[in-house]
């Protein structure tokens, strides 16, 4: 982070903080949209699947065009919330679950992106994610797209950390997010495979460069 001689944030940092704040406001606003229980056909399918026993859920998901991880997340979180708030509508819970990955991306913007690239890059990263056209529809949609976006983006950010530091934590996180992406959406699975291939190629190139 850059500071001026007076100890205040630089103009670029201030702009980044403002953009990050606006992104956070949009994410919080998405939570207020969760109170509506109106859902469409695909979301009805999600809710119906999440109400099934795990074995039945997996069997039905095997016949669907999407992998089962998202449905398992919805089922697990919904049942956990119902332990504490039994009367809360499951649709409201499911919509809030869809906001969580965007909050996770804000967390990545605030910590690793900010530490590596400063507030301006972190703010742009967060703002561009949360201000995409029609994103308010996707942030609360009871489908897996937000989670797929989160897993792929997080995996990408850990690829960068692997190339910089090579710490085992980042290897573990990259593996975890890559697997989660593959089990969230098939397009995300393709993206994860591309990240694995890119990492292997970059590590090979890095090793070759060191060797001479």
What is each of the regions a protein language model found here?
Residues 125, 170-186, 191-192:
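Membrane-interface alpha helices of multi-pass inner-membrane proteins
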Residues 140-144:
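Short acidic/glycine- and proline-prone juxtamembrane loop motifs at membrane-interface regions
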Residues 38-72, 76-84:
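Extracytosolic helix-loop segments that constitute the early lumenal/periplasmic catalytic or substrate-binding loops
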Residues 158-171, 191-212:
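Perimembrane helix-loop-helix junctions
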Residues 68, 72, 83-107:
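Loop-to-helix entry region of an early transmembrane alpha helix in multi-pass inner-membrane enzymes
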Residues 55, 76, 108, 128-131, ...:
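Specific aromatic-rich, kink-prone transmembrane helix
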Residues 20-24, 96-116, 154:
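Transmembrane-helix motifs of polytopic, lipid-linked glycan transferases
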Residues 12-43:
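Transmembrane signal-anchor helices characteristic of membrane glycosylation enzymes that use polyprenol
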């Amino acid at each position: 982070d850059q500071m001026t001689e007076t100890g205040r944030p630089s103009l670029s940092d201030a702009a980044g903080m403002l953009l990050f704040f606006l992104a956070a406001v949009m994410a919080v606003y998405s939570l207020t949209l969760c109170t509506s229980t109106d859902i469409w056909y695909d979301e009805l399918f999600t809710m119906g699947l999440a109400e099934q026993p795990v074995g039945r859920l997996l069997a039905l998901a095997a016949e669907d065009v999407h992998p089962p991880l998202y449905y398992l997340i919805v089922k697990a979180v919904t049942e956990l919330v119902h332990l504490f708030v039994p009367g809360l509508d499951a649709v409201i819970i499911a919509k809030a679950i869809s906001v969580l990955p965007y909050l996770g991306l804000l967390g990545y913007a605030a910590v690793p992106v900010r530490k590596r690239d400063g507030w301006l890059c972190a703010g742009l990263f967060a703002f561009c994610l949360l201000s995409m056209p029609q994103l308010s529809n996707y942030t609360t949609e009871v489908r897996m797209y937000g989670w797929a976006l989160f897993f792929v983006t997080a995996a990408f950010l850990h690829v960068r950390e692997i190339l910089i530091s090579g710490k085992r934590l980042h290897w573990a996180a990259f593996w975890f997010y890559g697997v989660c992406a593959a089990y969230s959406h098939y397009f995300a699975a393709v993206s994860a495979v591309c990240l694995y291939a890119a990492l292997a190629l970059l590590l090979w190139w890095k090793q070759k460069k060191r060797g001479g």
